[in-house]
């Protein structure tokens, strides 16, 4: 007996495992309200660098945006509804770019790499959004004597 794909459902590979649950689709096609979640703490640092070095990271059609400023950011998310109240941490590196295609133009941040410390959001983000994500250990920040430390 063969299986039939349900058009309104979201699938991840391999599709014969059935519809995939994740942040954009819960059980019985339920969407998540995320009214008071996630609880997020974010930190970042930005620095001016050599634009020619950044340009070597860009695919064809992209060019460096305003200034060659790299931003390294970390976000620590807790109480995420689609993760049954669990959370995860991310660390990303971005810089401003412009895309000037024959039809479309856009300005934004180019995400060079994104590290995460939980498999569920890595798989769903890669499969459903096309983000290239890498697993790594990202401990929560520690606060000691009024100073917050991220390692």
Language-model features: locations:
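Terminal interaction module
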Residues: 11, 15-25
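Alpha-helix initiation/capping motif
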Residues: 14, 50, 118-119
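Glycine-centered flexibility motif
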Residues: 14, 59, 129-131
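N-terminal ordered "arm"
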Residues: 22-76
């Amino acid at each position: 007996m063969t299986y039939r794909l349900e058009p309104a459902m979201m699938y991840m590979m391999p599709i014969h495992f059935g519809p995939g649950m994740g942040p954009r689709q819960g059980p019985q096609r339920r969407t998540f309200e995320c009214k008071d979640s996630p609880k997020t703490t974010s930190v970042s640092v930005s620095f001016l660098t050599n634009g020619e070095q950044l340009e070597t990271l860009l695919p064809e059609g992209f060019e460096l945006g305003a200034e060659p400023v790299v931003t390294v950011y970390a976000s620590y998310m807790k109480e995420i509804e689609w993760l049954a109240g669990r959370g995860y941490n991310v660390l990303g590196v971005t810089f401003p770019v412009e895309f000037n295609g024959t039809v479309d133009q856009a300005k934004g941040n180019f995400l060079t790499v994104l590290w995460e410390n939980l498999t569920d959001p890595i798989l769903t983000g890669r499969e459903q959004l096309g983000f290239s994500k890498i697993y790594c250990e990202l401990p929560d920040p520690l606060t000691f004597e009024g100073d917050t430390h991220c390692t």
